[in-house]
C-alpha cells in the first residue's frame, strides 16, 4: 500500500514526522513517499501543488497531509498561495466528503472551555460536503452593482448552489455513517431563508426513505451553532453543506479542549482519501518542537481505517493515544496542572511506546 506523505508548511513537517514514526512502528509496512506541497511546493516549483506532487497523490492509495500556509506568502496572487494546494487536491481527486470527529477524551475534560458535565463523553461526527456551495459557485467577483439601492457602486458577489447529485451523494455517506453509530442523523441548513437550503432539505428527506433504520432530523444553522455550545452531547452525526460545515466543525473542535487533538478525512466515492489534522500550519510555533502531533497521528489512524481497510491497526493507534493521555503526557496546548508536559517528538515517542 502506497501512502503519499505531504508535510507542507509551518508545523506540518514536525507533526507529520511523528505520524510517520507511528506508522513505521506498526506490524505492517507501508510504502511512504514524500513530496512538497503548499509553500514548500511553491519554493520547489513555483506552484503550491507541483505536477509531481499531484501525480503522486493520484497514484497513492491514500494521502497523509500536514498543513499549508505562511504569512510570508500573503502577498502572492491567490492562485499561488499555499492554501490553494488543498483546494486543488480536493478538486483533482474528487474528494467530496469531509469527516471531522469531535471527541472529548475523559483525560481532557478540564481542558474544554465548557463545564465538564457538558462535554464528558462527547463524540460527534460532522460530515461536510466539500465540492459545492458558495465556495465554488459561479458567477462570483466584484463589479458595479447592476440594480438595487446602490446601483453603479462597487459590490462583491458569490453564488450559493448545489446540484441534486452533489446532495444525494453526501446524504448517502452521512446516512451510512449514522448506521454505524447511534442511527441518528441531523441535517443542518438555513431553509427558512435560502432556496439552496430548502432544496438540500428536500433531497435529504427523499434519501432518508432508503434508510429506515436512521432517524433524520433538521436544524437551522444558527440554532445548531447555539446548541453546540449549550448542549453538545445531544448530537451524534451532523451532515451539512460546505460553508456551514466549515464553521460548525471549527466550533465543535473547541468543545474538546484543543483543535490539536482532532483529525479529519476527506474521501472520494471509493474511500480513497486525504487525511490531515483539523488545525492549521501555525507558523508562529514552527520549529520550536512544541506542536501537538496527536491530531495528525489520529489522522493516520483514520487513513488506515477508511482508505486501507486496516481497522485493527487503526484501533491500535487510537488505543495508544488514549494510553498516553492516561499516563499524563501533554503538549502545551492541552497541559493541565500535574501533567507530564512534553514536546512534539517526545509525544510521538510516547505513542510508539504505547503501541
From Swiss-Prot:
Cofactor dependency = Mg(2+); Mn(2+)
* Locations listed in the record: Cytoplasm
Q: Which residues bind substrate?
A: 90, 100, 128, 222
Question: What is the protein name stated in its UniProt record?
Answer: 3-isopropylmalate dehydrogenase
Point out the annotated site residues (description: Important for catalysis). 135, 190
Residues the entry annotates as binding Mg(2+): 222, 246, 250
Among InterPro entries, the record links this protein to:
IsoCit/isopropylmalate_DH_CS (IPR019818), IsoPropMal-DH-like_dom (IPR024084), Isopropylmalate_DH (IPR004429)
The processes (GO biological process) annotated in the record are: L-leucine biosynthetic process
**Protein family per UniProt:** Belongs to the isocitrate and isopropylmalate dehydrogenases family. LeuB type 1 subfamily.
For this UniProt record, give its keywords in alphabetical order, as a comma-separated list.
Amino-acid biosynthesis, Branched-chain amino acid biosynthesis, Cytoplasm, Leucine biosynthesis, Magnesium, Manganese, Metal-binding, NAD, Oxidoreductase
The pathway entry for this protein reads as:
Amino-acid biosynthesis; L-leucine biosynthesis; L-leucine from 3-methyl-2-oxobutanoate: step 3/4
Q: Give the reaction(s) catalysed.
A: (2R,3S)-3-isopropylmalate + NAD(+) = 4-methyl-2-oxopentanoate + CO2 + NADH
Natural source organism? Burkholderia thailandensis (strain ATCC 700388 / DSM 13276 / CCUG 48851 / CIP 106301 / E264)
Residues that coordinate or bind NAD(+): 280-292
Its quaternary organisation is:
Homodimer.
* A cellular component annotation (GO) from this entry: cytosol
Function comment: Catalyzes the oxidation of 3-carboxy-2-hydroxy-4-methylpentanoate (3-isopropylmalate) to 3-carboxy-4-methyl-2-oxopentanoate. The product decarboxylates to 4-methyl-2 oxopentanoate.
According to its UniProt record, the EC number is 1.1.1.85
Amino acid at each position: 500500500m502506497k501512502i503519499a506523505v505531504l508535510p507542507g508548511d509551518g508545523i506540518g513537517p514536525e507533526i507529520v514526522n511523528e505520524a510517520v514514526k507511528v506508522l513505521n512502528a506498526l506490524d505492517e509496512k507501508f510504502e511512504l513517499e514524500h513530496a512538497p506541497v503548499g509553500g514548500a511546493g511553491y519554493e520547489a516549483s513555483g506552484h503550491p501543488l507541483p505536477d509531481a506532487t499531484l501525480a503522486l497523490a493520484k497514484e497513492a492509495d491514500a494521502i497523509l497531509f500536514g498543513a499549508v500556509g505562511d504569512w510570508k506568502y500573503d502577498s502572492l496572487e491567490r492562485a499561488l498561495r499555499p492554501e490553494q494546494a488543498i483546494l486543488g487536491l480536493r478538486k483533482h481527486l474528487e474528494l467530496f466528503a469531509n469527516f471531522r470527529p469531535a471527541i472529548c477524551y475523559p483525560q481532557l475534560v478540564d481542558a474544554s472551555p465548557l463545564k465538564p458535565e457538558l462535554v464528558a463523553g462527547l463524540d460527534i461526527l460532522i460530515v461536510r460536503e466539500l465540492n459545492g456551495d458558495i465556495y465554488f459557485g459561479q458567477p462570483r467577483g466584484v463589479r458595479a452593482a447592476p440594480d438595487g439601492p446602490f446601483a453603479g457602486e462597487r459590490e462583491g458577489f458569490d453564488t450559493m448552489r448545489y446540484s441534486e447529485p452533489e446532495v444525494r451523494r453526501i446524504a448517502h455517506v452521512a446516512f451510512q455513517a449514522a448506521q454505524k453509530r447511534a442511527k441518528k442523523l441531523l441535517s443542518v441548513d438555513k431553509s427558512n431563508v435560502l432556496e439552496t437550503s430548502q432544496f438540500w432539505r428536500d433531497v435529504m428527506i427523499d434519501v432518508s426513505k432508503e434508510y429506515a433504520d436512521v432517524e433524520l432530523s433538521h436544524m437551522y444553522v444558527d440554532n445548531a451553532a447555539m446548541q453546540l455550545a449549550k448542549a453538545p452531547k445531544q448530537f451524534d452525526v451532523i451532515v451539512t453543506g460546505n460553508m456551514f460545515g466549515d464553521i460548525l466543525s471549527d466550533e465543535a473542535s473547541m468543545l474538546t479542549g484543543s483543535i490539536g487533538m482532532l483529525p479529519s478525512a476527506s474521501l472520494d466515492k471509493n474511500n480513497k482519501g486525504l487525511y490531515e489534522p483539523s488545525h492549521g500550519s501555525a507558523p508562529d510555533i514552527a520549529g520550536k518542537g512544541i506542536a501537538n502531533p496527536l491530531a495528525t497521528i489520529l489522522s493516520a489512524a483514520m487513513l488506515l481505517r477508511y482508505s486501507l481497510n486496516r481497522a485493527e491497526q487503526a484501533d491500535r493507534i487510537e488505543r495508544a493515544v488514549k494510553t498516553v493521555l492516561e499516563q499524563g503526557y501533554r503538549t502545551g496546548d492541552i497541559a493541565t496542572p500535574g501533567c507530564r508536559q512534553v514536546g512534539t517528538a517526545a509525544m510521538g515517542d510516547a505513542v510508539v511506546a504505547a503501541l
